Amino acid sequence: MKPRVTFDSRGSSGNIFSVLAITQTALRKERRINDFNECRDRVFASHSYDEALSIIREYVDLTDERGEK
């Protein structure tokens, strides 16, 4: 089961680096450091915000508080 991560796409937590930080915390709690490192590397290589969020969603249950994206 994927850990749940909530962010606000229109607030400061919508910044992709903030989303990654929240994701890192969630995955570390489950001792999935290698998964986070892989996720981070793939996000850094992505070409858009939407692509980055799509990658992150492969690792965590990512939910926008505003119901967007």
Regions found by a protein language model. Give the residues of each.
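Long, contiguous binding/interaction regions
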Residues: 1-69
